[in-house]
Amino acid sequence: MSKALYIAEKPSVAQEFAKALKINGQRRDGYLESQDSVVTWCVGHLVTMSYPEKYDIKYKRWSLDTLPFLPREFKYEVIPGVQKQFEIVKGLLNREDVDTIYVCTDSGREGEYIYRLVAQMAGGHGKKEKRVWIDSQTEEEIMRGIREAKDLSAYDNLSASAYLRAKEDYLMGINFSRVLTLRYGNSVSNYLNTKYQAISVGRVMTCVLGMVVRREREIRAFVKTPFYRVLSSIALEGENFEGEWRAVEGSRYFQTPYLYKENGFKEKAYAEKLIQELLVSQPLQCTVEKIERKKENRNPPLLFNLAELQNVCSKLFKISPDETLKIVQELYEKKLVTYPRTDARVLSTAAAKEIYKNISGLRNYEHTAEIAQHIIEQGNYKNLAKTRYVNDKQITDHYAIVPTGQGLNALRSVSLTAQRVYETIVRRFVCIFYPPAVYQKISLVTKIQNESFFSSFKVLLDEGYLKVATNSFAKRKAADAMSSVNRAGVAGNEGSEEEDPDTGKNGGNKADDSAEDMACDTRLLAALQNLKKGDILSVDSLSIKEGETSPPKRYNSGSMILAMENAGQLIEDEELRAQIKSCGIGTSATRAEILKKLCNIKYLALNKKTQVITPTLLGEMIFDVVNCSIRQLLNPELTASWEKGLNYVAEGSITEQEYMDKLEHFVRLRTRQVEDSNIQPYLRQFFDAAAVNYKDSSEKNSAKTTGRSTSAAGRSRTCRKPSASK
């Protein structure tokens, strides 16, 4: 009797397939078997690319004579620690009574690669191969995936992109790490007084290092600029509110060189002068020049993809992206949430049609039981497909991370943090079935003489989705916030994580901006509603508020993941930015691991309490070496464009050979440029400039510095190179 063979990526996933298939047969060594089915598993990767010395022993010794290393055919080998399981899977693949193979590895590029390597190494089994593609591990979804499984050949382009990604990382890592180590490793080790220093380089890893080092140097080079704002205290029916002066057209200071932006002065004396000029008119009064009232909606945020979830968990729980991925992977394997390694923040049309089941299951989840019941009773889910939360065009492999509504008993077996991560996912999900929060926005312009003062108020009228957004473990904080809302009538950020993608640009200078929306109690709100143009109000006082510009913020582990996801926005070339606008560096499956590796090899340091990321001295030195030799590796343009190329291969837009030709040309050209270069004479000055910032750190060891100032160390430095390396 012919049997079907199901190959999962992990033993735990294989168990779920066995349950769904009702396999009650014997458990054997490395697989489960019934009368008509066999279920086995990999343990992640069973096969890997061989080291260069497996091609020829001469490659074991690092030498410029053997670079660039560009094999015509790539060699692979079984990973020694999993040899036994590989032999089991190989034997099952070639069993005579197996006629159909169901590939059940993770539904994505890496899962595809895991199986293809095993099949390649196992030899010609000549069976029918079907690909199971699922979004969760619920029994219903597993059976749907098996019923709708396509021929494996439908995923050949995805497989090609997976092989190319591995070859790309392999060739860049081996060639660039070896050539840079051979040329400049001694410069680094001699400076640090260490015995030997390999220079580790990677397509994505080095780009991330560049982002962190550049940000740190921007912070060091930043010089705070003081500025002085002029504020009016305006009386209205026994209440007071502020107006902020701005040098708009008609002001005596309009476009003068004394200004810092339009709402402040560079020097305090000019702010004092303005006040004296305005105080000439007594009694001090202002006229309502303009008043605007409008309602403003704040929509529920988009659903979680992995990057957004990692960012939020970094803020809420102070855990690293790697920890978040482990937690959400565990929740996925326990059937609690959908597939975690996704870049999408929306649902598919097909998923939206079945979303009732997810909501219905959440009626059994204590924290959202009433919410889920309300959504079902009101039928809020019925028009979901027409909202911005459903968009098939924004989905590649998988839709957003949402709760399945199943497996709730498994919550007892996970950590407290995992339980809270789950609730965070659930809250984000149920929010999309609620209306927007509604605010009353009041904008007011008053004039004293010809000088304009601006006031802005934002009042919460209807909580909308905010009423269900607050996590239960944050109740006290939320209650305090809501109490404040009820007293002041002003909306806070009650329980809602706003989308805050750090694109890596110099943001965060709140002090530079105009005054934020002001608090407004019930009496003041009523008075403002009655105001009209031409009304004259009393001004109690004029004052000066001093501020200063803020440096860029350091990345934390969450904002770093978002910066990697949004790295396309960092590209200055408008045409290139448009081409790869949605393509970041790395993938949702690899970003956390890359960040972890940079910390493990001591190029970056992660503060576990704050999750703030900073470079180490070694990391800055490696940055300087790469910046002077293969600068392209530090730039998002290169990394994101390679990633876009892999997507083109997966889509069938370009061929595997076209991509490979470009890759080999790049590796060959850059390797030879480094071989021909000589930047040692310039590296010392860069190392010195970085080291001065670590003079109190054990990192520096006994390395000598030039004693340059911190600001000098932070200044942009140009690496001059001999013509041979151009």
Where are these regions (language model features)?
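C-terminal or mid-to-C-terminal helical accessory/interaction module adjacent to the motor/catalytic core
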Residues: 74, 87, 96, 137-234, ...
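Basic, low-complexity terminal or inter-domain segments flanking catalytic cores
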Residues: 2-5, 28, 82, 93, ...
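Conserved short loop/turn motifs at secondary-structure junctions
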Residues: 2-3, 104-107, 196-198, 293-302, ...
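C-terminal accessory/connector segments of nucleic-acid motor ATPases
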Residues: 222-245, 284-321, 327, 336
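Metal- or metallocofactor-binding catalytic centers and their adjacent structured scaffolds
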Residues: 255-302, 310
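Intrinsically disordered, low-complexity regulatory segments
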Residues: 1-178, 265, 474, 495, ...
